Amino acid sequence: MTSILFEDTFEVKEIDPDGKKFDRVSRFVCYSENYEMDLQIDIATHIYPLGHERFKMVLASSLNLDGSSDNSGSYDTNKPSLADKYDYVMYGKIFKYQKENSSSKVSVFASFGGLLVLLQGDPRYLPGIELDARIYLLIKKA
């Protein structure tokens, strides 16, 4: 059993397209290499500096390597986890799942302690994503 709900490599296309709103956070506009997904993601750049680079992003329901459920939002740092393979990890909630009327795309909105994520694309590549689900977002540079 796997806890990975989505996985792809993204390339940063724009940084803060509407201007810088916060000192330590930037909004990145990205496009995926494999599934043609659009991504807007807020990242705490004082913790995880990112420029016009490629990065791998995973959405997961749990950090447990065996895929077992983890609803606590925390994990035991003394045992191996999915987080060990990534540089930047956030825990949050899907707060909006919207189907586009004019196309076969969906828009998934998530909040990670106020840092927002918008992932848009073909719903075939987002089968385990559900409204109100608690998820982990994991990133490492490609």
Curated annotation (Swiss-Prot):
GO cellular component, one term: RNA polymerase I complex
Entry's localization field: Nucleus, Nucleolus
Pfam families: RNA_pol_Rpb8
Main location as per UniProt: nucleus
Alphabetical list of SMART domains matching this protein: RPOL8c (SM00658)
InterPro entries recorded: NA-bd_OB-fold (IPR012340), RPABC3 (IPR005570)
Keyword tRNA-binding: no
GO MF term list: DNA binding; DNA-directed RNA polymerase activity
GO terms classed as biological process: transcription by RNA polymerase I; transcription by RNA polymerase II; transcription by RNA polymerase III
Region Non-specific ssDNA binding, residue ranges: 16-40
Keywords (A to Z) from UniProt: DNA-binding, DNA-directed RNA polymerase, Nucleus, Transcription
Presence of the UniProt keyword Lipid biosynthesis in the record: no
Gene3D superfamilies documented for this protein: Nucleic acid-binding proteins
Family: Belongs to the eukaryotic RPB8 RNA polymerase subunit family.
Subunit annotation: Component of the RNA polymerase I (Pol I), RNA polymerase II (Pol II) and RNA polymerase III (Pol III) complexes consisting of at least 13, 12 and 17 subunits, respectively. Directly interacts with POLR2A.
Chain's role: DNA-dependent RNA polymerase catalyzes the transcription of DNA into RNA using the four ribonucleoside triphosphates as substrates. Common component of RNA polymerases I, II and III which synthesize ribosomal RNA precursors, mRNA precursors and many functional non-coding RNAs, and small RNAs, such as 5S rRNA and tRNAs, respectively.
Name listed for the protein in its UniProt record: DNA-directed RNA polymerases I, II, and III subunit rpabc3
Protein's organism: Dictyostelium discoideum (Social amoeba)
The gene coding this protein: polr2h
